[in-house]
From Swiss-Prot:
Allows the formation of correctly charged Asn-tRNA(Asn) or Gln-tRNA(Gln) through the transamidation of misacylated Asp-tRNA(Asn) or Glu-tRNA(Gln) in organisms which lack either or both of asparaginyl-tRNA or glutaminyl-tRNA synthetases. The reaction takes place in the presence of glutamine and ATP through an activated phospho-Asp-tRNA(Asn) or phospho-Glu-tRNA(Gln). This is Aspartyl/glutamyl-tRNA(Asn/Gln) amidotransferase subunit B. It catalyses: L-glutamyl-tRNA(Gln) + L-glutamine + ATP + H2O = L-glutaminyl-tRNA(Gln) + L-glutamate + ADP + phosphate + H(+); L-aspartyl-tRNA(Asn) + L-glutamine + ATP + H2O = L-asparaginyl-tRNA(Asn) + L-glutamate + ADP + phosphate + 2 H(+). Its EC number is 6.3.5.-. Belongs to the GatB/GatE family. GatB subfamily.
C-alpha cells in the first residue's frame, strides 16, 4: 500500500495598516459607502501617475527583518497583466524580479516539536477591488474602494506537511505582524488572506506532485478543513490512476468541498514587465538601521520576559502574549496595580470564560486597565470578596463599569461593622439550635454549616475570619 505525504506552501496576502493607499492619498478605511474611497489613480484613469507611499516600504522591510529575510537594497515594481472586472487598469503593480525581501524563515512548534519554515520572498503590491453579486438584478457590481490598498504577499517555501503546521505558521505570522503594527490581520475584513498551494507525493519521492491552489478560506478552521479536503481529493485521484490537474480551486466551507475555478497560471502567463511609472528604489543601510531600531518587542521575547520578570507560569505567559491586545491589557493593568500574578489569574480564568461564553475573540476585547486595576486593589484591601469581585469583573468585561461606583450603587461592599456581623450570627444561632448542640457534642461539621449560613445571610459581604472569630466566641458562651 502506498503511503503519501502532503506538501504545502502558502501565499499570504496582508493588508498594511497605513492611513492612505500605496500609490495615492485615498483612505484605506474598511467599509464605507461604495466607491467613495477611490480617485482617478485608483481607477486607472488615463494620464494619472502613481506616487509610492514610503510607509508601505517601511512596513514591508519591518516584516522582512522580523522574519529573518535578506533585504533587497535595489528593488523595483513590475506590472502583472491580466483582465478581471475588479482590476480597472487591467494590470496590477506588484514585484516579480526584485522583491523587497527574500530568503527568510520563522520557527513554529507543533506537539512540542520545533520546525523552521522558509520564507521564499515578501513583495509589495496593490489590492484589487471587490465584486458584489446582485441576485435581484442578476448581475455583478464592482466596488473599487479596495483598489490600491497596500499589500505585502508573504510566500513560504513548500515546507509544511500538515494542516496543524499550516495553522501554527499562520498564527506565528499573524502575531509577528500584529506586534509590529504592520497589519491588524482581521480575516473577517480581508486584511489577512491565505492561498494554499498543495500537492501529494509518495513518501521518499524527491519530486513534487502537481499542485493546486486553494482560495476563499476566511478563517483558520476553514483553512484546516480545506487542506484536509484537498489532500483526500488528490489521494483518491492518484489511487484511481488519474492525474491531478494544475488548477485554482475555490473552497466552499458550507458544502465542505472545493470547485475548480480556472487552470493554474504560471508567471509567464501574466506577461510581467518593469513598471515604467515608478523608478527603482535604493534602500540604504541607514534607513534599514532606523527601521530595525523601531522594532517593538515581539511575542517570543515578551513571553520570556513575562516568565522572568513577572514570575507567571510559562503556559499563562504563552496564552496572554498569544493576543497582542491581551498582552497590552496585562501590561497596562500591571503598571497601575503592580500585581502581575493577580492580573494573570483574572485573565486566564474569568476573562477566558467570558470570552468563550460571548464567542468573542481576544483581539476584540475592550477591557479598561484602570477599572481592572481598581478591582484588584479593592480585593487586596479586603473591601470585596472574590465572589462579589467575579460579579463586578463581569460588568467591567461587558460595559467597562467603574468598580467603585458599581459596588456602591448595588451595595456590594464588605460589612466592616463587627456589630452587624455579631447580630447576624446571634440570629443564626437562634434559628439553628440543633447545629449548636451538634457542635457542642464535638461534631465539627456543624461549625462549617453555621459559617455557611452566616455568609448566606450576609450575601458573602463579611470577612470569613471575622465570622469565624465571633462565631467561636458566641458558641463558647452558648
Amino acid at each position: 500500500m502506498k503511503v503519501y505525504e502532503t506538501v504545502i506552501g502558502l501565499e499570504v496576502h496582508v493588508e498594511l495598516a497605513t492611513k492612505s493607499k500605496i500609490f495615492c492619498g485615498c483612505t484605506t478605511q474598511f467599509g464605507g459607502e461604495v466607491n467613495a474611497h477611490c480617485c482617478p489613480i485608483c481607477m486607472g484613469m488615463p494620464g494619472t501617475l502613481p506616487v509610492l507611499n514610503k510607509k508601505v516600504v517601511e512596513f514591508a522591510i519591518a516584516a522582512g527583518l522580523a522574519m529573518n529575510c535578506d533585504i533587497t537594497k535595489n528593488c523595483k515594481f513590475d506590472r502583472k497583466n491580466y483582465f478581471y472586472p475588479d482590476l480597472p487598469k487591467a494590470y496590477q503593480v506588484s514585484q516579480l524580479y526584485l522583491p523587497i525581501c527574500r530568503n527568510g524563515s520563522i520557527e513554529i512548534e507543533v506537539d512540542g516539536i520545533k520546525k523552521s519554515i522558509g520564507i521564499h520572498e515578501i513583495h509589495m503590491e496593490e489590492d484589487a477591488g471587490k465584486l458584489v453579486h446582485d441576485p435581484w438584478e442578476d448581475c455583478t457590481l464592482v466596488d473599487y474602494n479596495r483598489c490600491g490598498v497596500p499589500l505585502i504577499e508573504i510566500v513560504s517555501e513548500p515546507d509544511m506537511r500538515s494542516a496543524e503546521e499550516v495553522i501554527a505558521y499562520l498564527e506565528k505570522l499573524k502575531l509577528i505582524l500584529q506586534y509590529l503594527g504592520v497589519s491588524d490581520c482581521k480575516m473577517q475584513e480581508g486584511s489577512l488572506r491565505a492561498d494554499i498551494n498543495l500537492s501529494i507525493r509518495e513518501v521518499g519521492e524527491p519530486e513534487f506532485g502537481t499542485r493546486t491552489e486553494m482560495k476563499n478560506m476566511n478563517s483558520f478552521k476553514a483553512i484546516a478543513r480545506a487542506i484536509e479536503g484537498e489532500r483526500k481529493r488528490q489521494i483518491e485521484l492518484l489511487e484511481d490512476g488519474k492525474k491531478v490537474i494544475q488548477e485554482t480551486r475555490r473552497w466552499d466551507d458550507n458544502k465542505d468541498t472545493s470547485f475548480a475555478m480556472r487552470s493554474k497560471e504560471d508567471a509567464q502567463d501574466y506577461r510581467y514587465f518593469p513598471e515604467p511609472d515608478l523608478v527603482p528604489m535604493e534602500i540604504s543601510e541607514e534607513w534599514l538601521t532606523e527601521i530595525k531600531g523601531r522594532e517593538p518587542e515581539l511575542r517570543d521575547a515578551k513571553m520570556l520576559r513575562y516568565v522572568k520578570e513577572y514570575e507567571i507560569p510559562e503556559y499563562d505567559a504563552g496564552i496572554i502574549t498569544g493576543s497582542k491586545n491581551l498582552a497590552d491589557i496585562f501590561e497596562a493593568t500591571v503598571s497601575l496595580c503592580n500585581k502581575p500574578k493577580e492580573v494573570s489569574n483574572w485573565l486566564m480564568v474569568e476573562t477566558m470564560r467570558l470570552l468563550k461564553e460571548s464567542e468573542q475573540d481576544a483581539e476584540e476585547l475592550k477591557l479598561s486597565p484602570a477599572n481592572f486595576a481598581s478591582l484588584i486593589e479593592l480585593i487586596d484591601a479586603g473591601k470585596i470578596n472574590r465572589t462579589i469581585a467575579k460579579e463586578v469583573f463581569e460588568q467591567i468585561f461587558k460595559a467597562n463599569v467603574d468598580p467603585n461606583a458599581y459596588i456602591e450603587e448595588h451595595g456590594l461592599g464588605m460589612v466592616s461593622d463587627d456589630g452587624v456581623v455579631r447580630s447576624t450570627i446571634e440570629n443564626i444561632l437562634k434559628e439553628n439550635v440543633q447545629s449548636v448542640s451538634d457542635y457542642k457534642n464535638g461534631k465539627d461539621k456543624a461549625f462549617g454549616f453555621l459559617v455557611g449560613q452566616t455568609m448566606k445571610a450576609m450575601r458573602g459581604k463579611a470577612n470569613p475570619s471575622v465570622i469565624n472569630e465571633i462565631l467561636r466566641e458566641l458558641l463558647s458562651k452558648a
